Amino acid sequence: MNLDFLFYPQSVAVIGASNKEGKIGNAIMKNLINFGFKGKIYPVNVKEEKILGIKAYKSVLEIPENVDVAVISIPGKFVPQTLEECGQKGVKGVVVISAGFKEAGNVELEEKLLEVARKWNIRIVGPNCLGVTNIENGFDCTFNPPERQARPEFGGIAFMSQSGAFGAAILDWAARHEVGMSKFISLGNMADLDESDFMEYLKDDKATRVITAYLEGVKDGRKFLEVARNATKKKPVVILKSGRTEAGAKAAASHTGSLAGSYTIYQAAFEQTGVLEARSMRQLFNYAKALTMQKPAKGDRVAIVTNGGGAGVMMSDGVLEVGLKMADLSEETKEKFAKAIVEGKLPAHMSYKNPIDIIGDAPSRRYEVAMRYALEDENVDVLAVIALFQSPALDEGIVEAVGRMQEYGKPVVFIAPGGAYPCLLYTSPSPRD
């Protein structure tokens, strides 16, 4: 599915544009102007001659040139007729910010909206949504002002949200935690385009490395299963699913009209399709940020290298608790460790079972030997490296040593528990293929 016309438009009409501070149509105009959108902006307002210094039109039909996308922010009862005019104009995509449809019990109005859209072959985002953002080209037709909601820098994470307010909080959080994003979609009621449509588009989007979502429910279960299964073959998909309890499901129904369904069914669907489920906002972006830096593991076998026995034990518990396996090191790898001990490269009283405990006086060069042996083992899919910097023996060379492990093409997770000292050494690596 190609939705480039929604994210890379050459022109946009803002229907309901306003000069009045505090109005949604005013905020949308300012965001399009201030965040660097290079296309043409056509404000539509029946009363004003100009909006923020730009010539205004009384109807989208009066605009003399082509319009790729229209953003509608007017009372809901007027939206179907306005959409009819968009169809006559040849508009390809419409973002309906307006509320008062299915989520408010007005099912017939939403059905009328969809009827008009199908008549003219228009694709709709919403209604009852915050808007969409393409951070790559500055196309931001959301309505939250930057002094209230920061915008993240361009990066590899796409995020779609069934809650506009939660989506805004995510964007703000991502900006303040330096998490780069490619695109943001507020799904709203999903009268037309739904989570599966956008997932299908994003799986082929070159700017997106990881697809993330906040979902209360899916529109079409069979469609979601098929699309998610195909999407996860190309790039990671991480979903924060709400409505997990009976109370949450009821709240979802009143929020967007979503049928949250049985949470156990969703869990099974995620497992079958390879979707990674997050349980909190922080977890969602921790997963996503990690997955933009390195490719997913090819298997579930984890090796641990540590300079602290207790930390290795706790990590072993964690590996099994999340459904992964502790790797069984091959005989060849064990022989490498034994030989290195004889040669004095590794201490005699270390353990080269998994976890690989290189003991508390380990410098970075000892870590490098152990990490290489583990990553060269075909039985190891993921390496977890625990570095307790409280030991004076551990030098800052460990940071560069861990970075060199990327040559093996396997995910490496670096854990440095404790205080501020590791933060002074750590610099975030650039995303790599």
Give the role of each language-model region.
Residues 1-428, 432:
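Catalytic-core regions of core metabolic enzymes
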